[in-house]
Amino acid sequence: MSEYNASYRRIFIIGNGESRKDFDLTQLRKHGKIYACNAYYRDNPLPDVLVAVDSTMTHEIYHKGIAHKIPCYFREWTKCPNFMYQTMKQGFLSTQGKDKEDKFVTNGDSALPIGDYFVMNSHTIKGEATIRREDGTTYKKMVDNTHIYNSWITPGDKTQEWEDPGYHAGATAGHIACKYENPNEVYLIGMDLRSDTKYYNNIYKGSKHYSSAHYEPSPTGIWESEWLQVFKHNRWVKFYKVNKSDDDKLTNTKLLGDEQNLEYITQAQLLDLLKQK
């Protein structure tokens, strides 16, 4: 856990944009609490709080035991009594007109209850999909896949009850930090709103539960809109959007307007700033 002075509440929100790839995040530990998103836990020391909003990631994180080590905020994480297990599973399938799922992911026996409570979610892709090959060419394919994700709840987990604003993971982490930590300052690191290349911008692209490294950049207008809502709803908090540098790369573009409680700084400026505090 962090070694920071709790009398001054500083939060670092860590996104998974590629701008943070070579930035040593361990330098932040003594200066504030670290809120991170999704697969951050895979290759970094555990943050103080982990946020995930997609069922593929929430169940991965739970199955890895992370939710028993640190507080985790998961979307659609409703714990159901075990007698509902088969009924809920069949309900997911019947809504898709299927007798059997295409993939079932669980941390226990797929047929028998192994605990008092469980969380179950489904993910369906149905219709015509555009498939991108590694050489950049594409082709059309009809798909109809239903994946079901299940987690048997084990004692001592730190999943949280919370008010979900419905944002993507980054802005959701910002919302949670402001609501429950009452911070003085919030720093956005690796929260890239654009891509410097013609490809998807994410450190974990191409890995399990992430889009292919060959995908086009994600449309990000909704991300910007969500962050602006976080700024406006927390006027008393000073926000810093930490870019890798101040050059003209797309990831360094000042896309979040000129909100009075928002300032743009570089990673180098962040380190200088923390030395003074």
Question: What residue spans do the PLM features occupy?
Answer:
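Metal-ion/cofactor- or nucleotide/acyl-coenzyme-handling active-site neighborhoods
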Residues: 1-277
